[in-house]
Design a protein with these regions (language model features):
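Helix-start/capping segments and mature chain N-termini
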Residues: 1-63, 84-259
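Ordered, amphipathic secondary-structure segments that act as subunit-interaction surfaces
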Residues: 70-81
Length: 259
């Protein structure tokens, strides 16, 4: 991570203008590296903003991992592309940061199963199609959930549930998967799980109660245990699929990049 301070009036500070990716590290192996890098660069291209090169992102990541052994320990790798200058059309106004962090305790606990609640309507994710640092709605919703004794808050679009505050949401539907509907962040981890299968739509409350799970780079995959205090079913086939996917993330070299 750059040791240089960020100006107090930088766009990323005053207006949350920046972008980031969070990756699971297993030792020095970055899980779903290619897909995360692709999403970051595609976002910047779609918004016609300056972008770092893939080589620069990889170099910064390697530097951040200095001294870390290639063992089975799990950590978080955060990649940030943030606006520190006022003229955001100029490459010089942007800064690339890469940092290694511990996985948050709430995330580790959520892996064992998540108690979820419906996010209050007053909390809405800003520009949900982009992984931006403008994250107030998600942070506020997750804080609200934690105060209620839950691990995750779920956003709705009308009557359909779309995503969690920090995770993607998929309904099992007896193996006919559904999730990643309009209005949610395109999830790298959920796409890796689905591998092109499933219906791309919001899901109903009844579908979630019948069996559903959360997906995220650090959460990996976790069943939803309850929704607003109502118990959710956990079909054995769904639990087996979750565990198989988690093991793939940890051990499949095709899904990893050694830094």
């Amino acid at each position: 991570m750059s040791p240089d301070p960020i100006p107090y009036d930088a766009p990323v500070v005053e207006r949350g203008f920046g972008f980031f990716e969070t990756l699971l590290l297993v030792g020095r192996r970055a899980v779903l590296w290619d897909a995360h890098l692709r999403r970051l660069l595609a976002t910047l291209e779609a918004l016609e903003l300056p972008a770092p090169s893939g080589e620069a992102v990889e170099s910064a990541s390697r530097a951040a991992l200095a001294g870390i052994a290639d063992d089975d320990a799990e950590r978080s790798l955060r990649l940030s592309w943030i606006a520190i200058g006022h003229d955001v059309e100029q490459p010089a106004s942007w800064r690339l940061d890469a940092s290694v962090r511990a996985i948050p305790p709430n995330t580790l606990e959520r892996r064992e199963g998540s108690r979820a609640m419906t996010a209050p309507d007053r909390f809405r994710r800003d520009s949900s199609g982009f992984k931006s640092t403008s994250y107030f709605g998600a942070v506020a919703a997750l804080r609200h959930a934690r105060k209620a004794g839950c691990h995750e808050a779920l956003f709705r679009d009308g009557d359909a549930y779309v995503e969690g505050s920090s995770t993607a949401l998929v309904a099992w539907n007896g193996g006919r998967l559904a999730g990643l509907g309009p209005g949610g962040l395109p999830s790298v981890t959920a796409e890796a799980f689905l591998e092109g299968a499933g219906e791309r739509r919001g899901v109903g409350r009844g579908e979630l109660l019948a069996g559903s799970f959360l997906l995220g780079s650090l959460t990996t995959a976790a069943p939803v245990l309850s929704l607003d205090g109502e118990e959710c079913a956990r079909p054995p086939a769904m639990l087996r699929a979750i565990e198989a996917f988690r093991e793939r993330l940890r051990s499949d070299a095709a899904l990893q990049k050694t830094l």
